[in-house]
Amino acid sequence: MSTAICPCGSGNLLDACCGHYHAGHPAPCAEALMRSRYSAYVLGLIDYLVATTLPAQQAGLDRQSISNWSAQSTWLGLDVESSEVLGGQPEHAFVTFTARWHDGQGEHSHRERSSFVQNSGRWYFIDPTVQLKLGRNDACPCASGQKFKKCCAGYFGS
């Protein structure tokens, strides 16, 4: 058992916090998934970052860029401002946070309001940088069985 403190900022041990999700257990809520994804960046767990992105977007991720950013950054902290569960079927949520890191260009701070969707008992990050070619009447990429316009359309970046 690790005695390392979890990088997500909870103050808990990694094994009792985000490490539990990194080992394959589903995050119980969008905020827990977001915290575990931040910890995955800190720890270089690229497979986890890909696996927790909406499955329809995973092929569009640049694994090498994610790996480079993770490895070349010194992660300075995470502050969660709010977590908003919107309900519905499938369930959607927003998490607003600020992540801080240092790299070769200096210190950075990034504030984001991320979108998440739950399907089959698992939460997924909807990546606004990975565009999908979908019409409003196409099946939703979250696999809910609904039309895109009635499900996740409002949660994708414009």
Curated annotation (Swiss-Prot):
Entry's transmembrane regions: none
InterPro entries listed in its UniProt record: NTF2-like_dom_sf, SEC_C_motif, UPF0225, YchJ-like_M
Pfam families in the record: SEC-C, YchJ_M-like
Family, per entry: Belongs to the UPF0225 family.
Protein name, as recorded: UPF0225 protein Pfl01_1218
Protein species of origin: Pseudomonas fluorescens (strain Pf0-1)
